[in-house]
Amino acid sequence: MTVSLPLVFDAPRRGMPPRHLADLDAEQRRAAVAELGLPKFRADQIARQYYGRLEADPARMTDLPAPVREQIGAALFPRLLDVVKHVACDDGRTRKTLWRAGDGTLLESVLMRYADRNTLCISSQAGCGMACPFCATGQGGLNRNLSTAEIVDQVRAAAAALRDGAVAGGPGRLSNIVFMGMGEPLANYKRVVAAVRRITAPAPDGLGISQRNVVVSTVGLAPAIRKLADEGLSVTLAVSLHTPDDELRDTLVPVNNRWPVAEVLDAARYYADTTGRRVSVEYALIRDINDQPWRADMLGAKLHKALGSRVHVNVIPLNPTPGSKWDASPKPVEREFVRRVNEQGVPCTVRDTRGQEIAAACGQLAAEN
């Protein structure tokens, strides 16, 4: 096995859109409105339209005078994301959206309807620089970071689609957000944290989704995990571990060459200690690569030692990607792996995978037009 791409932590600075309302916190919104010569109360009025009514077109904000709509449209609502296409499966209850940003950059998000929740998987970067060889996004390389507004607007658009009954299953409410789409969220740290705050703040400052229903994933950027722990947020941390030993992880997750397993688990323990939140560990099970019984035993033992009862393992059957030489482990092997991890005192379940047939499942997002 070889790594075909280098790790990229510093994204190209090209293509970022102009300032948008969703890039700004409450104080910055008021300052931006004042710069336009408008009274400060307009800032909350505009924010209530965007976050509360899920309206992104100033021309439709009819409680504002027409001249104000034109003014704020030019200053605070640059073109962000246009739908290229929707693709659905699961009787329409799983819907992947391909977006085109203002500079032509392509990205994807996936909306999944369940009996008890509606979950949106969002992208934080266009592409990914972490170069994991079993992931289509990682093998495509990194185009650029997404702006805070580009991240937030994926959520606003999905919430509006659910509210309006545009997704199979009738009108509904968006309840859960997972930063598990394209990109390494903690490599776009500042914008992702700002987006989390906008997504979770109550209107008029945000979309009002509970922090406890937000998951931020990472391949293991240990210093950023510790930094996130100190942000005062209550989001769930998901660590994409994929193997408990450094020898294999150096290849499967190349960032392990910088922050090995022990360092990642130390950071995860700090996150659990600081936030009081249980950590999720993601494990893509690959036939004859990381599915051996001894690896299950090692995984359970290391996680129990590092995190005790504050960890849960999600086993993910490997999703196929174009040209991949790997495939998912057989079901008996998967069941034995889960059993052995549980035997070590660590809760372990197989994650319900949605969207495989439309290339919308974990590791499949490639933003192909």
From Swiss-Prot:
<feature type="binding site">
    <location>
        <position position="128"/>
    </location>
    <ligand>
        <name>[4Fe-4S] cluster</name>
    </ligand>
</feature>
<dbReference type="InterPro" id="IPR027492">
    <property type="entry name" value="RNA_MTrfase_RlmN"/>
</dbReference>
<feature type="binding site">
    <location>
        <position position="217"/>
    </location>
    <ligand>
        <name>S-adenosyl-L-methionine</name>
    </ligand>
</feature>
<keyword id="KW-0489">Methyltransferase</keyword>
<dbReference type="GO" id="GO:0002935">
    <property type="term" value="F:tRNA (adenine(37)-C2)-methyltransferase activity"/>
</dbReference>
<keyword id="KW-0408">Iron</keyword>
<keyword id="KW-0479">Metal-binding</keyword>
<comment type="function">
    <text>Specifically methylates position 2 of adenine 2503 in 23S rRNA and position 2 of adenine 37 in tRNAs.</text>
</comment>
<feature type="binding site">
    <location>
        <begin position="240"/>
        <end position="242"/>
    </location>
    <ligand>
        <name>S-adenosyl-L-methionine</name>
    </ligand>
</feature>
<feature type="disulfide bond" description="(transient)">
    <location>
        <begin position="121"/>
        <end position="362"/>
    </location>
</feature>
<keyword id="KW-0004">4Fe-4S</keyword>
<dbReference type="Pfam" id="PF04055">
    <property type="entry name" value="Radical_SAM"/>
</dbReference>
<keyword id="KW-0698">rRNA processing</keyword>
<dbReference type="InterPro" id="IPR007197">
    <property type="entry name" value="rSAM"/>
</dbReference>
<feature type="binding site">
    <location>
        <begin position="183"/>
        <end position="184"/>
    </location>
    <ligand>
        <name>S-adenosyl-L-methionine</name>
    </ligand>
</feature>
<keyword id="KW-0819">tRNA processing</keyword>
<dbReference type="InterPro" id="IPR013785">
    <property type="entry name" value="Aldolase_TIM"/>
</dbReference>
<dbReference type="InterPro" id="IPR040072">
    <property type="entry name" value="Methyltransferase_A"/>
</dbReference>
<keyword id="KW-1015">Disulfide bond</keyword>
<feature type="active site" description="Proton acceptor">
    <location>
        <position position="108"/>
    </location>
</feature>
<feature type="binding site">
    <location>
        <position position="319"/>
    </location>
    <ligand>
        <name>S-adenosyl-L-methionine</name>
    </ligand>
</feature>
<feature type="active site" description="S-methylcysteine intermediate">
    <location>
        <position position="362"/>
    </location>
</feature>
<dbReference type="GO" id="GO:0070475">
    <property type="term" value="P:rRNA base methylation"/>
</dbReference>
<feature type="binding site">
    <location>
        <position position="135"/>
    </location>
    <ligand>
        <name>[4Fe-4S] cluster</name>
    </ligand>
</feature>
<dbReference type="GO" id="GO:0000049">
    <property type="term" value="F:tRNA binding"/>
</dbReference>
<keyword id="KW-0411">Iron-sulfur</keyword>
<feature type="binding site">
    <location>
        <position position="132"/>
    </location>
    <ligand>
        <name>[4Fe-4S] cluster</name>
    </ligand>
</feature>
<dbReference type="GO" id="GO:0046872">
    <property type="term" value="F:metal ion binding"/>
</dbReference>
<protein>
    <recommendedName>
        <fullName>Probable dual-specificity RNA methyltransferase RlmN</fullName>
        <ecNumber>2.1.1.192</ecNumber>
    </recommendedName>
</protein>
<dbReference type="InterPro" id="IPR004383">
    <property type="entry name" value="rRNA_lsu_MTrfase_RlmN/Cfr"/>
</dbReference>
<dbReference type="GO" id="GO:0005737">
    <property type="term" value="C:cytoplasm"/>
</dbReference>
<comment type="similarity">
    <text>Belongs to the radical SAM superfamily. RlmN family.</text>
</comment>
<feature type="domain" description="Radical SAM core">
    <location>
        <begin position="114"/>
        <end position="357"/>
    </location>
</feature>
<keyword id="KW-0963">Cytoplasm</keyword>
<dbReference type="GO" id="GO:0070040">
    <property type="term" value="F:rRNA (adenine(2503)-C2-)-methyltransferase activity"/>
</dbReference>
<dbReference type="GO" id="GO:0019843">
    <property type="term" value="F:rRNA binding"/>
</dbReference>
<keyword id="KW-0808">Transferase</keyword>
<dbReference type="GO" id="GO:0030488">
    <property type="term" value="P:tRNA methylation"/>
</dbReference>
<keyword id="KW-0949">S-adenosyl-L-methionine</keyword>
<dbReference type="GO" id="GO:0051539">
    <property type="term" value="F:4 iron, 4 sulfur cluster binding"/>
</dbReference>
